[in-house]
A protein has these predicted regions:
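Bacterial lipoprotein signal-peptidase II cleavage site
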Residues: 21-33
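Alpha-helical secondary-structure segments
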Residues: 131-138, 177-181, 224-225, 252-254, ...
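Surface-exposed binding/hinge segments that line
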Residues: 153-206
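Ligand-site clamp/hinge motif
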Residues: 242-288, 414
Length: 539
């Protein structure tokens, strides 16, 4: 007889249209062919307005939440706020962490004390000067908001603040307006990368406290190249150049984010010349990539992450069954038929370009006969029943789940696809009620810890998988600063997770595409899908 398999979670860790750490897939859309035909062969016009201002217009989905990454981790939130607020340090496309608001810190011999000096006379948009006390306030607020608080868990005093027994972060000591130190509990190699994330942006304490619940809605003040003029759900967000920007003169006059939900309508508006930037959804990529008028305006990049299968081992702990599930998915077919050639079958959970990636590993394969044998060895000679739960907000995920349903039959796995709304999905995943689900995750900073960390903590580990050797390697990896040592440590850690315990197994690596007005130069996008316009211009 068949037995029900509980506890498989398909986790998407690839860049998505809405979230940095959750939610991915295609929006509901009209026919791409109809849209392309309606638009004809028109191309985008220059974004310069009649009075000579240079305003870039960006098509985007509606965040429908406050523009505050400390509370909401949607990627569209950060696409906007990254041009308004800044962190102490920044990141480059190759993973380096140069200065932004502070000079590179002096680090103690034991790698546990970081001494910072802020750059002089950095102004917030309200005219006040950046102070070290604003840095401390911003990091304490991050912990109080809880959403991404664990980024700072290695700072002395974090435990007390997160437990509610302390109101301030004792590990940060402010010496004066421009000098402060951060004390860690133990050496933590990715620390500077963590401080470069959008979650660690620096807010002016006085203005943020005064705004209260309106922070990110009617008020958002930073040190960035652009300041927020307006934000209206259902309409858009407008930004204007900050003339006192510490980074020097900015060519653009502003940014105009237009909230458009339908992916084809977004591209249609681009072809009409009404927007200058638009993401190209995989579902419509074949139509627009073959358009000769758009060929030179289509750009691609590979975000750091991959779609993966994660197993709730608290409910079902046999690695043979987890391996069987991994073998029952035809990744190549998904890449070709669902993602239309915009993705490739992975060899490693840790993406290329990050420490710990192993080039020597083979691709994860589709082998339903081997899956059958493994299920029989595990005590399931007649196969298993598996429920796949998907969030109806992301129809692309529904398509993947449906494809998986057909592919798994050959392995003796009977898949039921369950569709739920966002609220139900979040609750079920948090409480272990998802047998198999599709969501997304990709790195917040270019370090293997950002990829593997969710598998070590209860609050982020939806698989409920734990392995003592894996956890030990993770502790070793963050404690050493030697890159060669870290490479070997994380290779071993991933092998345990994806090739021995099969707690997580990748599905695909995706290439994201976007259309950009050819008159625009200097636009920057890094490997974590963050967009920066401060060096852009319109020719």
């Amino acid at each position: 007889m068949r037995k029900t398999l509980a506890g498989i979670v398909l986790s998407c860790v690839i860049a998505a249209s809405l979230t940095a750490c959750g939610g991915s897939g295609n929006s509901t859309s009209t026919s791409a062919a109809e849209t392309s035909a309606a638009a004809g062969d028109s191309t985008s016009a220059a974004a310069t307005t009649e009075n000579g201002d240079k305003v870039v217009r960006v098509a985007a989905v509606d965040p429908q939440v406050a523009l505050d990454p400390q509370q909401f981790t949607y990627s569209i939130v950060m696409k906007i706020t990254d041009n308004i607020t800044e962190s102490l340090l920044t990141t480059t496309s190759d993973g380096l962490v140069p200065t932004l608001l502070a000079a590179m810190p002096t680090i103690s011999d034991d790698n546990m004390t970081y001494s910072f000096e802020l750059l002089p006379d950095v102004k917030f948009h309200d005219g006040t000067t950046l102070k070290a006390s604003d840095v401390k306030y911003s990091y304490e607020r991050l912990i109080k908001m809880a959403k991404m608080a664990t980024l700072l868990e290695n700072v002395v005093g974090y435990d007390e603040m997160s437990a509610g027994t302390a109101d301030e972060l004792s590990g940060i000591e402010v010496q004066d307006d421009t000098h402060f130190t951060i004390q860690l509990k133990k050496p933590y190699a990715p620390f500077l990368s963590v401080l470069s994330t959008a979650y660690c942006a620096i807010y002016p304490q006085e203005a943020c406290e005064a705004a209260g619940n309106n922070w990110g809605m009617t008020t958002l003040i930073g040190t960035g190249a652009f300041k927020l003029d307006s934000y209206q759900t259902g309409v858009g967000a407008t930004l204007s150049r900050f003339d006192d920007y510490h980074g020097g003169a900015v060519a653009l006059s502003g940014l105009d984010y237009k909230f458009i939900e339908d992916v084809n309508t977004q591209v249609l508006e681009y072809q009409k010349g009404n927007v200058d930037y638009v993401d190209v959804d995989p579902s419509i990529y074949p139509v627009y990539s073959s358009n000769p008028d758009l060929k030179d305006q289509m750009h691609g990049f590979q975000p750091t992450g991959c779609y993966s299968l994660t197993v709730n081992s608290k409910t079902y702990d046999d690695p043979k069954v987890r391996e069987a599930i991994a073998l029952s998915i035809d990744r190549k077919a998904i890449c070709e038929s669902i993602l239309h050639g915009t993705a490739t079958v992975p060899t490693s959970y840790i993406p290329a370009g990050i420490i710990g990636h192993d080039d020597s590993l083979p691709e994860f394969e589709y082998d339903p006969e081997q899956a059958k044998s493994l299920l029989a060895e595990a005590g399931y000679p007649n196969g298993i029943d598996l429920r796949v739960t998907v969030n109806t907000k992301y129809q692309g995920n529904v398509a993947i789940a449906t494809a998986f349903q057909q592919q798994a039959k050959a392995a003796g796995i009977n898949v039921e696809v369950e569709q739920v709304d966002s609220a139900a999905w979040s609750d079920m995943k948090k409480n272990g009620g998802v047998d198999c689900g599709i969501s997304n995750w990709y790195v917040d900073y270019s370090d293997p810890e950002s990829m593997l960390y969710p598998m070590t903590k209860t609050d982020t580990n939806s698989s409920f998988w734990h392995n003592a050797e894996f956890d030990k390697l993770m502790d070793e990896g963050i404690a050493t600063t030697d890159e060669a040592e870290r490479q070997e440590i994380y290779k071993k850690a991933e092998h345990i997770m994806t090739r021995e315990d099969w707690a997580t197994t990748p599905l695909y690596n995706e290439t994201k595409f976007y259309l950009l007005n050819p008159h625009i130069t200097g636009f920057e996008m890094d490997a974590t899908f963050r967009m920066f316009w401060k060096n852009a211009d319109i020719q």
